[in-house]
Amino acid sequence: MPDSDNDSGGPSNYAGGELSSPREQDRFLPIANVSRIMKKALPANAKISKDAKETVQECVSEFISFITGEASDKCQREKRKTINGDDLLWAMTTLGFEDYVDPLKHYLHKFREIEGERAAASTTGAGTSAASTTPPQQQHTANAAGGYAGYAAPGAGPGGMMMMMGQPMYGSPPPPPQQQQQQHHHMAMGGRGGFGHHPGGGGGGSSSSSGHGRQNRGA
């Protein structure tokens, strides 16, 4: 048979040289994968014939079916639907392939460790992403509750009861700017009207001026 690198998963020969059916071919590993694995064990300039590839293809496919079938029987007896790695290792031991068990146990252990780390990292990343996407409105409300708890609503009277964040509060807020201007104006007027006022006296500067005026008119 001529040498060929055809990796299309060509037909395998069965009883009397008859070609296998398409359904029979479905249970084989892709011949391209088989060829790639075989080449890793050979020198760079080595070649593999087509019949060698097909022989190994059939061999490894049969081995997989053999081990998987034994593990499947175990799962059926235990009324389980999922075959796991431990079931396959048990099947290899039962069928006499103990030499494969120890290295595969080590591989299975490392594989599960890596998967666990990936799951933990994914969970942590999801939590961080959720925290970073907190709506700005909630953050503003939290800041207002913490930093402006003593602020009173405009228009609340002195000593009056105010509501802030749903809680009653008491206090005298600073008057609005307009009210401050009015108070300042009244204070200025009062200061001018009371000029000349003496402690204990009943009259002010304006009263004295009025008296002098009346005297002048009488004269």
UniProtKB/Swiss-Prot annotation:
Heterotrimeric transcription factor composed of three components, NF-YA, NF-YB and NF-YC. NF-YB and NF-YC must interact and dimerize for NF-YA association and DNA binding. Interacts with NFYC2, NFYC4 and NFYC6. Its main location: cytoplasm. InterPro entries: CBFA_NFYB_domain, Histone-fold, Transc_fact_NFYB/HAP3, Transcrpt_fac_NFYB/HAP3_CS. This is Nuclear transcription factor Y subunit B-8. GO terms for biological process: regulation of transcription by RNA polymerase II. Transmembrane segments: none annotated. Residues 56-67 are annotated as: Subunit association domain (SAD). Residues 29-35 bind DNA. Residues 190-206 have a biased composition (Gly residues). Disulfide bonds: none annotated. It holds the Pfam family CBFD_NFYB_HMF. Residues 119-134 have a biased composition (Low complexity). GO terms for cellular component: CCAAT-binding factor complex; cytoplasm. Residues 1-26, 119-142, 166-219 are annotated as: Disordered. It is found in: Cytoplasm. It comes from Oryza sativa subsp. japonica (Rice). The keyword Chaperone does not apply. Belongs to the NFYB/HAP3 subunit family. Coiled coil: none annotated. The keyword Transcription regulation applies. Component of the NF-Y/HAP transcription factor complex.
